[in-house]
Amino acid sequence: MSGRGKGGKVKGKSKSRSSRAGLQFPVGRIHRLLRKGNYAERVGAGAPVYLAAVMEYLAAEVLELAGNAARDNKKTRIVPRHLQLAIRNDEELNKLLSGVTIAQGGVLPNIQAVLLPKKTEKK
């Protein structure tokens, strides 16, 4: 007996951590950036996976709302204006990105109620 155990395990094709977690965002790159960014002395194995999942979810949410805004304006391409409309019309995203200025985003159309013409009753 040479002590090799039962059947040698052959390593198959390597699988990225992103694909293991079912994500599109790069877990390995986020892990590297967390280590290099002096955020903490050590970074756990689950932290970059969690962060990648959160970032992917937020990106998908913003893109879906911006796509809806583009479709409402009969456009096929998302431009900064559509991002602005999507974010500012969503209460939670607006709160999250309240301190963010989107270049070429414009403003939300809004007319104060006191500036609107008075409605007169006709008898």
From Swiss-Prot:
Q: Which SMART domains match?
A: H2A (SM00414)
Q: Which UniProt keywords apply?
A: Acetylation, Antibiotic, Antimicrobial, Chromosome, DNA-binding, Isopeptide bond, Methylation, Nucleosome core, Nucleus, Phosphoprotein, Ubl conjugation
Localization: Nucleus; Chromosome
Q: Which residues form each disulfide bond in the chain? A: none
Domain of life of the organism encoding this protein: Eukaryota
Q: Hey, what's the signal peptide range on this chain?
A: none
Residues annotated as carrying Phosphoserine in the record are: 2
Per the record, the covalent cross-link Glycyl lysine isopeptide (Lys-Gly) (interchain with G-Cter in ubiquitin) lies at 119
Question: GO CC terms for this protein?
Answer: nucleosome; nucleus
**A GO biological process this protein is involved in?**
defense response to bacterium
Positions of the UniProt region annotated as Disordered: 1-22
Return the Basic residues bias intervals.
Answer: 1-18
- Coiled-coil intervals in this record? none
Q: Which InterPro entries match?
A: Histone-fold (IPR009072), Histone_H2A (IPR002119), Histone_H2A/H2B/H3 (IPR007125), Histone_H2A_C (IPR032454), Histone_H2A_CS (IPR032458)
One of the entry's Gene Ontology molecular-function terms is: DNA binding
Q: Carries keyword Heme?
A: no
Instruction: Kindly list the positions at which N-acetylserine occurs in this protein.
Output: 2
Function recorded in the entry: Core component of nucleosome. Nucleosomes wrap and compact DNA into chromatin, limiting DNA accessibility to the cellular machineries which require DNA as a template. Histones thereby play a central role in transcription regulation, DNA repair, DNA replication and chromosomal stability. DNA accessibility is regulated via a complex set of post-translational modifications of histones, also called histone code, and nucleosome remodeling.
Q: How does it assemble?
A: The nucleosome is a histone octamer containing two molecules each of H2A, H2B, H3 and H4 assembled in one H3-H4 heterotetramer and two H2A-H2B heterodimers. The octamer wraps approximately 147 bp of DNA.
The family annotation for this protein states: Belongs to the histone H2A family.
Protein's recorded name: Histone H2A
